[in-house]
Amino acid sequence: MKYQVVIGLEVHVQLLTNSKIFCGCSTRFGAEPNSQTCPVCLGMPGALPVLNKKVVEYAIRAGLATNCRIAPRSVFARKNYFYPDLPKGYQISQFELPICIDGHLDIEVEGGMKRIGITRIHMEEDAGKLVHADVPGVGDDSCVDLNRACTPLLEIVSEPDMRSADEAVAYLKKLHQIVVYLGISDGNMEEGSFRCDANVSVMPAGSDKFGTRTETKNVNSFKFVKQAIEYEIERQIEVIEEGGKIVQETRLFDPNTGSTRSMRGKEEAHDYRYFPDPDLVPLVIGNDWVEDARLSLPELPDAKRQRYTDELGLPVYDAEVLTATRELAGYFEACLALSPQPKPVANWVMGEVTRALNEENRSIADCPVTPPLLADLLRLIEKGTISGKIAKTVFDEMWRSGKAPEKIVEEKGLVQVSDTGAIEAIIDEVLAKEAGQVEEYRSGKDKLFGFFVGQVMRASKGKANPALVNEILLKKLNG
């Protein structure tokens, strides 16, 4: 029997605010356990939450960037459950009236586009963290770190529109790129700033009735999401074909085995006994607030890619690479403003700049070759002062020393030879030395032309103007 896979994702995005959602405690990652807490974080009696305005602004920006409608009125609700890392005994979230609804993202699937619906985006606080590893002085006991409690989150809930693990990863990558572009999250998956719950079910192909779903919690890498979904698909199909039934449950992914395991029975909404939080008034968002947020949005990746292909004439591949991060796109555009040659600038940014960054594991913000320096280098190539090959040598020296390209060219005597007389002399010397190869070329072995070009460039120590070398060499060989 053939099966249809149904996938929906719930993505938790930790927001890049300095303070928590309902108190003034720091959100800094990596602090000493329980050093960033207060009576609100700890759920002490009488401590009242105060909503962080920045969290609301970030939620609105996320909603606009994902084509959602911003609700004019939304309400915080208490999600009641017991867990050691939840000191209040409930989590402040949103239920019936979230801040953003009815959005979508378009993803590329097998050369075409597919629209993935977004049911809702809501604000909520994170729970604390249980540490199960051995702790000095504690032994094998589990410890609770409440630094993360009350940290602001957005939960972005998709429609069950994905039909493969690849589609789920494509959606997740696009969402990740958007929240990082917006500057509302650092997207650090290792630190838990961007994590995903994957809801997976299977049903007979052609059926319109969804199967029983399982939820795999807190998967924190694109690779693991793909593995978890693919494993869960295979597991569910195997259970069904052996005559069993899928249990609606919450599962955990084990990256060491690439498998999922049962964690607990899957709760329904009524199990959490949601009700409006009496300590927080309904949130009313006016049109002015929404429009201000809309005007503050940066150019998003899709629009930027389209502009690069339509207005700059760049290939689709180049546009995708250059818009991978907002910082890389900014570097490219800063170079382009100083040296308006889209394709050459793109080639250098995607080539030498990216290579050097990767070799030293640097970010583009830490690039020692600034846009003005790279633009100066490209101008030297354009004017014919140096060749493209020599330019790579100059770039490496710029990277190491931070010197201007003109100074490096002058100090090392790298100016390109464009004097026809000097180039002719070098060519004559090479042809005289390779008389046998010349005869073979003239007998029809045209491929030897590249050999002669290489010999001339070697004899000139790479300084000869390649265009002139080709032109003069062709005349002499065919003359």
From Swiss-Prot:
- Which E.C. number(s) belong to this protein? 6.3.5.-
Matching InterPro entries: Asn/Gln-tRNA_amidoTrfase_suB/E, Asn/Gln-tRNA_Trfase_suB/E_cat, Asn/Gln_amidotransferase, Asn/Gln_tRNA_amidoTrase-B-like, GatB, GatB_C_1, GatB_Yqey_C_2, Gln-tRNA_amidoTrfase_suB_CS
Keyword set, alphabetical order: ATP-binding, Ligase, Nucleotide-binding, Protein biosynthesis
Q: Which GO terms describe its molecular function?
A: asparaginyl-tRNA synthase (glutamine-hydrolyzing) activity; ATP binding; glutaminyl-tRNA synthase (glutamine-hydrolyzing) activity
User: What catalytic reaction does the record list?
Assistant: L-glutamyl-tRNA(Gln) + L-glutamine + ATP + H2O = L-glutaminyl-tRNA(Gln) + L-glutamate + ADP + phosphate + H(+); L-aspartyl-tRNA(Asn) + L-glutamine + ATP + H2O = L-asparaginyl-tRNA(Asn) + L-glutamate + ADP + phosphate + 2 H(+)
A Pfam family assignment? GatB_N
Entry's Gene Ontology BP terms: glutaminyl-tRNAGln biosynthesis via transamidation; translation
Give the quaternary structure.
Answer: Heterotrimer of A, B and C subunits.
- So what does this one do? Allows the formation of correctly charged Asn-tRNA(Asn) or Gln-tRNA(Gln) through the transamidation of misacylated Asp-tRNA(Asn) or Glu-tRNA(Gln) in organisms which lack either or both of asparaginyl-tRNA or glutaminyl-tRNA synthetases. The reaction takes place in the presence of glutamine and ATP through an activated phospho-Asp-tRNA(Asn) or phospho-Glu-tRNA(Gln).
What family, per the record? Belongs to the GatB/GatE family. GatB subfamily.
Family annotation (PANTHER family)? GLUTAMYL-TRNA GLN AMIDOTRANSFERASE SUBUNIT B MITOCHONDRIAL AND PROKARYOTIC PET112-RELATED (PTHR11659), GLUTAMYL-TRNA(GLN) AMIDOTRANSFERASE SUBUNIT B, MITOCHONDRIAL (PTHR11659:SF0)
This protein is called Aspartyl/glutamyl-tRNA(Asn/Gln) amidotransferase subunit B
Organism in which the protein naturally occurs: Geotalea uraniireducens (strain Rf4) (Geobacter uraniireducens)
